[in-house]
Structures are given as structure tokens and as C-alpha cells.
Amino acid sequence: MAAPEPSRPGTIRVVIADAGPLIGLARIGCLDLLRALFGGVTITAVVAAEIGIDAEPDVCADRRPGASAIAKARAAGWLSIVESTAVPDVEPLNPGVDSGERTTISLALHWQAAGAQVLVIVDDRCGRAEARSRGLPIIGTAALLVVAKQQQLIPACAPLMAALREEGYYLSDGLVAAVLAEVDEA
């Protein structure tokens, strides 16, 4: 899929995700929160490869945890894949940025320059710092859960954060405490 161009500045909201948040949410059965919150999400082909899904709508390249649910989201049409070659590559300022984060940030910058309102879903510290340094708005998995609770899409954050941790998804004690305090679950 080629990168679409917005017709008027500020009229298109594009949500672009890195692999980590998608995998984490898929592994705890909450991937559909992204559809409920944003309607649709875009990933780059590099991120799709990291996850283990193919460009074909219902093909799961392997059996990595969460890959099947993410492939189903692609087949349902609310998760789209953009070829990484469809946008100019941006050299990261931070050497810790991986290829998925790099292409996610490149795509977000491309669409932002074309006038779209973008939001980047990323959890990795280096990826978040890189996106922030380039003026991109970001949100992480923990904040997504806060928004989902505020919009009454989930009854509580604590069990989902615990499930993420049980699946090996890193959430610092400080982050968990801050989120639970924010949603009155401390």
C-alpha cells in the first residue's frame, strides 16, 4: 500500500504503531481497543515483519505470540500496512532506535509534513525519545489503557497491566503505580 496523501492540512488523523504495543495488546486479548479508540491503525512493512505477519490480509507468517490476532485485524481492514519504501527514510538521532521504530517515525514525519495529524504508538524508550525529539505526538500502551478506561471501554487497568507483565511485557513499577493512581485503582 502506498502512503496516502492528505487532501487538506490537519484533516486526517493517522495513527501509526510500532510492533511492541500491538504485540502486547494482542497477547492479552485487547488488540481491539485500538480499533475502538482510533478506528484504524497503520504499521510499516518492517513492523509487520517484526510481528510475523505477511502483507496478505489473512496470512500469519509464523506463530509468534500475538501475530495471529494482528493478522486478523489486518484481514478485518482496520490495520493497514504501508510499504516502508513508500516514504523517505529518516536517519535516527538515537543509535538505539530499531528498524521498526525508524520506519514508524519516518512514516509519521512524512504524513505530518503532508498536513496530517499523526499519533505514534510506541513504548520503547529510545523510540519514544526519537519521536519526541522530532516533535511527534506519542502514546504508549499504559496510556492507551488509561484512555480506554476513561472512555469506559474497559472496567479497570490493573488486571490488564498485570496480564501484560505476566506475558513478559516490560512496564516499570513507577509507570504501573502512576497509571493506577491516575485511574483511581491505587
Regions found by a protein language model. Name each.
Residues A2, Q117, R128-A186:
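Acidic, PIN/NYN-like endoribonuclease modules and their adjacent C-terminal/linker elements
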Residues A2-L119, R125, R134-L136, G174, ...:
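Active-site-proximal, substrate-binding regions of enzyme catalytic domains
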